Structure formats: C-alpha cells, structure tokens
C-alpha cells in the first residue's frame, strides 16, 4: 500500500498535470499568435469592447490581462466588497470606472441598468449567477467548467484564463497555471512534513459573530488545506450544491473537533483570539491556546476564496503554522514575485505589509 508521502506527492502532481492539460487543449488562438512574440499585443483587436462579469472570482483573472481588463465596464459588487482597495487602486488606478450598480442589493441583476452599460458580452459563474441573462440579447458565457472543478482551484482558474482568451480573441496565456506550479512546488517539501504530523485544521469561511460557517469535503477550502499538508476537521460533513460548501456549525461542534490551527476567511481572527464574538468561547480549543488562529490575507480580493492571489495561500498557511518552514521574508518574496509575473506590478512595501497583517 502506498504510504502517506507518496499519496500526497500524487495529489500535488495530479493538480499540476490537470492544469497543464487544461490550457494545453486550448490552443486555437496560440496557433495564429506565438506566445513568445508578444511585443505588439496592444495592436491586437478584441472581439468585444464592453465586458460585464457578474461574479467576483473570475474578475481577478481578467485583471491579469490588460487587453481584456481595459474593456470591463461592470462587475459584481463582491469583487470590491472584500478587497484591499488601497492595493487595488495602486495597481489599477482606473478601477473606479468599473461599476457594480447593475446588481441590486439583493444580488439580483437589474436588467435595465445592465443594458444601460451597452455590454457586448456577459460572463457569469454557474446557474446561481445566470439570472436569465439571455434577456439582454447578447452573448453570455458560463465560466463554470463543471464536474469536480468546484473544488479544483488550479483547473478552474486555468479554465477561466483560457475562456477569456478564446472568447475575446486574445493570445493564449498561462499565468495562473504557472503561478500554481511555482507555489505548489515551493510548498511541497514542507507540506509533506506537516502531513506526517497529522495537523488538524479548520477552514472557517465565515465568523461574523452571528454564524459559524466552515468548508466541508470537496470544497476549495478543503483543497487548500490538503495543499498545505493539513487535515480538514470538517471532512465528514455533507456538502450539498453550490451553497452547501459553506456549512453552518455550532461552537460545540468546533470544541469537539478541537483543531490545531484555524484559518478565518470572512471574519476576524483577532476578534476570535480576543473572544469578542458573542456566543462563542474559544478558550478551550488547542488552536486558541497556541495562538494559531489566522485571517487569510486580503489583496485584490480575499486569498481564502478564489482570488488572483490564492495560488499563494498554501505558502501562507505553511508560514503561519511554522515560520521555520517558510519565513515571513520568504512569503513576502513569493508574493512580490507573484504580482510581478501575473500583473507586472511592483507592490510597495507598505501595501505588502498591510496585505499580510493579521485582521
């Protein structure tokens, strides 16, 4: 029987192979435009001049392609709601031109407002974001790759990058596949060490003082923990549908799990460590006693979702669990490199420090 290390190596290898296969099969554009001859990309005409994206996660991918980004006129409000706007405006000084007003406060598309934007193409993610968009009478593209991609971030982001390039008539690129390869290769030896220690982690999607929602099995959160070599304490929970990936649990359930480390996505690790959330008492949980409760960083979006920076999340998790494995300085170097390679952006020291601080 294969031992744990071999199984983990196969897990990482399969992720990298899947991402490579995903973009290798999408070479229609690259047949006519050589990736290595990109000096005159500004002259390449785009098929659609006014782009709308209803979801927040794919927006981070299109931001990495200036040829496409400059044509985005509307995006879902979550794209900015959970962003570090200081960083976003530093990278994209024109970001204020992009509106979110075509989506109402109840997250339903306002068709009149949408049509006023005169879009040429609309991208959405999954049935829950469709909202009868065909009423607009223009091309609509579903960015849901289907199947198990709901918990495969590498394949999903690679698919989005390919889909944007193909539908907009842009050159083939593989920035996000490459980013995941860099991160997973750097994380691998340390993730294997952590795996041998059987570290039990909780991926706390939401902790707002009212609800506690966690990532169960076959979710992005579950995958991120595995990438860092950790075991998901909520792996036995039942996941149902898109919304089912966020599972409500009680404080008593978390006490019973007694995780070694907790990663907080939408919420504040500081509030938990200071016991500021009403109805929650974390005192007897190992992660609390050891001070191992951390907020996922917020950059262009929250790293803990599926953002433009999520490829860095396994490195962040390893760094927080044991800074002797990946130091704070090494995490900063990796983050700088990511922004440079994916966005051609030099992040200022102050913004990088702010992004990685505990919330």
Where are the model-predicted features located?
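Structural recognition of the beta-strand scaffold that forms the well-ordered cores
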Residues: 52-54, 73-76, 121-125, 140-144, ...
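Alpha-helical, coiled-coil/dimerization segments enriched in small aliphatic residues
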Residues: 216-244
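Bacterial N-terminal signal peptides
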Residues: 9-19
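Short helix-initiation/N-cap motifs at beta->coil->alpha
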Residues: 37-38, 96-111, 238-251
């Amino acid at each position: 029987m294969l031992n744990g290390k071999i199984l983990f190596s196969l897990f990482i290898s399969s992720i990298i192979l899947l991402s490579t296969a995903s973009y290798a099969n999408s070479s229609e554009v690259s047949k006519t435009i050589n990736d290595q001859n990109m000096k005159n990309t500004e002259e390449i005409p785009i098929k659609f001049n006014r782009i709308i994206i209803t979801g927040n996660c794919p927006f981070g991918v299109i931001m990495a392609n200036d040829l496409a980004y400059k044509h985005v006129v509307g995006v879902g409000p979550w794209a900015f709601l959970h962003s570090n706007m200081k960083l976003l405006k530093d990278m994209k000084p024109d970001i204020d031109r992009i509106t979110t007003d075509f989506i109402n406060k109840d997250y339903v598309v306002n068709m009149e407002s949408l049509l006023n934007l005169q879009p040429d193409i609309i991208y959405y993610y999954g049935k829950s974001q469709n909202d009868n968009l065909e009423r607009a009478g223009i091309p609509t593209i579903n960015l849901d790759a289907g199947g198990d991609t709901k918990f495969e971030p590498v394949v999903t982001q690679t698919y989005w990058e390919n889909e944007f390039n193909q539908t907009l008539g842009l050159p083939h690129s593989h920035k996000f596949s490459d980013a995941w390869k860099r991160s997973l290769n750097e994380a691998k030896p340390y993730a294997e060490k952590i795996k041998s220690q059987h570290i039990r982690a909780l991926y706390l999607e939401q902790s707002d003082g009212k609800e506690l929602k966690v990532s169960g099995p076959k979710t992005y959160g579950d995958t991120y923990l595995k990438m860092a070599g950790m075991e998901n304490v909520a792996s036995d929970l039942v996941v149902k549908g898109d919304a089912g990936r966020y599972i409500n649990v009680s404080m008593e359930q978390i006490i019973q799990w007694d995780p070694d480390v907790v990663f907080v996505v939408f919420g504040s690790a500081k509030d938990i460590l200071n016991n500021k959330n009403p109805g929650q008492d974390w005192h007897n949980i190992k992660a609390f006693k050891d001070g191992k409760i951390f907020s996922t960083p917020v950059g262009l979006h929250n790293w803990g979702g599926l953002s433009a920076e999520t490829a860095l999340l396994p490195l962040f998790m390893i760094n927080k669990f044991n800074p002797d494995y990946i130091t704070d300085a090494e995490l900063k170097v990796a983050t700088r490199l990511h922004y440079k390679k994916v966005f051609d952006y030099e992040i200022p020291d102050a913004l990088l420090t702010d992004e990685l601080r505990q919330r």
